Amino acid sequence: MKIVILDGYAANPGDLDYHLLEQLGEVVVYPRTSDEEKVERAKDADIILLNKVQMDAETLAQLPNLKYIGIQATGFNVVDIAAAKKQGIIVTNIPAYSTDSVAQMTFALILAVTNRVEHYTQENRNDRWAYNKDFCYWDTPLMELAGKKLGIMGLGNIGMKVANIARQFGMDVCACTSKNSCDLPEWIQKVSKDGLLATSDILTLHCPLSDDTYHLINEENIGKMKDTAILVNTGRGPLVDEEAVAKALHDQKLGAYCADVMSQEPPSKENPLFKEPNAYLTPHIAWATFEARKRLNRQVAANVKAFLEGNPINVVNP
């Protein structure tokens, strides 16, 4: 059984091993694979594993030996699911492996803004504290989270984890969710989308990307938010109209934008968000803690093993 990993570097730059997969077949690992290389590299594979390499219908048609695609991520929009099913190829993903890490990153971004960590670190390096007349130095407002309203768009695994962390900070938690109110903890208030936009001091996005949620945060909806609101996106880049957000930041119609994802990855250096000092941007690292990648690595092998035993799990094209 030949197993080909097409873009292994992002999830495993060398600090993990593939011993669990190697027990299941011959493993060939490529750090990265371009569109021009993917057919040649996958043509003899029974199983391919990938993260962001695109597998469209045209590509799949050139891989008649392929039996299984294991996506090394939760999202599976990189594969044409319908075409794979038509061709008899099972496709699996890795759900919930990075819940804790993404929730942690969500609050890392929130705290970086409310406590102005980057600003004061730089001011300290510039000797502003060293030459200050007082025992402390601060020149910008700081925000306490207790009593502030955190709005959550989407209450899946990550959204619920974020809600629980917010509760420990003493925040008031409200959410726009498809779940029934009776299925929510009593301390989470279910509200409409417009209600969430209008009342949130901090709004964080944890909904899946779909036709309905593409550019969910656009110029119109930003206009419904508080001018001081902090918007956080650790979900999917295209949930947000980045040009509209950049304009709102520039016009002081939005307090801050924190994102670990962007509409194009890697982003263009011309992206208008890079010009805005109140845009706090990290390079899609929320999922990438060692612990989360270790869980990912193990579950990838478990998915392959289950497939080989005839009882596939985490199938996204049943």
Which residues does each PLM region occupy?
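Glycine-rich Rossmann-fold phosphate-binding loop(s) that bind the pyrophosphate
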Residues: 155-156
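Short, flexible hinge/linker loops that cap or flank conserved catalytic cores
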Residues: 142-146, 167, 223-224, 273
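Rossmann-like adenosine-cofactor binding region
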Residues: 55-61, 179-272
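N-terminal Rossmann-fold NAD(P) dinucleotide-binding loop
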Residues: 159-160
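Phosphate-binding beta-alpha-beta segment of Rossmann-like dinucleotide-binding domains, i.e.
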Residues: 87, 95-149, 316
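Gly/Ala-rich phosphate-binding loop of Rossmann-like dinucleotide-binding domains
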Residues: 163, 167, 249
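An N-terminal-biased, well-structured beta-alpha scaffold segment characteristic
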Residues: 1-92, 198, 218-220
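Rossmann-like dinucleotide-binding domain for NAD(H)/NADP(H)
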Residues: 91, 172, 219, 228-318
